[in-house]
Amino acid sequence: MFSSLLDLRVHRVYHISTWFGQVRESYRKPPTSTLVNGFGNHVGPRTSERELTYGVFGEDGKLTKLCIGRYVEFAPRLDLKSLSSCSPSAYLAFMIDIDIIRDGRTVHLLHWYQPDLVLAHKTHELVQTCSDRKGALYGAPAPPGGSSHRYVELVFQQPLNFTFPESFEHYLEPTIPARLFFNITEFAAAAELGNPVAANYFTVLGTRTSTEEQQIIEL
């Protein structure tokens, strides 16, 4: 049920991003080849150069352009040209794996949560401000060999008096058991967030020796 709710929500977000224009993200090159992801799992040297294919949606809602980026090892740099550079707002960013299977059902895993992001004037990049608010450290995609997982990225406008819901505190721990069963719909309701302002997703296919990413497809 949660997967269906999220799929519907993300489908709506793609239409929102179409109205606003291009929504794009890229990834910084990792400084070293030492690969331990945010969950403390050794990934292996060949996964350091996973390729991300992301798309640009035209006014008709169709995927019009494919570009190649690299390195999903670390948290993404979010470039949102669709948002006004004069906006005084702060933003929240999430990355969620929506294809985790547990006990025969699909559940979600929180890979990243970052509050207090603001839009840089010249670059349109969402950058972190000095803040006492905790985030959920980034955990790189590493699906089991032979399985294909979708990773959804969502950006919300942060309310002026934003308070992190106490019932979700355990999701901030950097372990897989703590991050399982995250529900973005319930979080948005508890935190009194509005609709997302931007979203994207990519698909990762896990293999025994490396992780290769597939071309983005429309929902």
From Swiss-Prot:
Annotated family: Belongs to the tstN family.
The name this protein goes by in its record: Phomoidride biosynthesis cluster protein N
InterPro entries: PEBP, PEBP-like_sf, PEBP_euk
Industrial and biotechnological uses noted in the record: Phomoidrides A and B (also known as CP-225,917 and CP-263,114) are potent inhibitors of Ras farnesyltransferase and squalene synthase. CP-225,917 and CP-263,114 inhibit Ras farnesyl transferase from rat brain with IC(50) values of 6 uM and 20 uoM, respectively. CP-225,917 inhibits squalene synthase with an IC(50) value of 43 uM and CP-263,114 with an IC(50) of 160 uM.
A Pfam family recorded for this sequence: PBP
Function comment: Phosphatidylethanolamine-binding protein; part of the gene cluster that mediates the biosynthesis of the antihypercholesterolemic agents phomoidrides which are dimeric anhydrides. Within the pathway, phiN is not essential for dimerization and its function has still to be determined. The pathway begins with the highly reducing polyketide synthase phiA that catalyzes the formation of a C12-fatty acyl-ACP, starting from one acetate and 5 malonate units. The hydrolase phiM is involved in the release of the C12-fatty acyl chain from phiA.
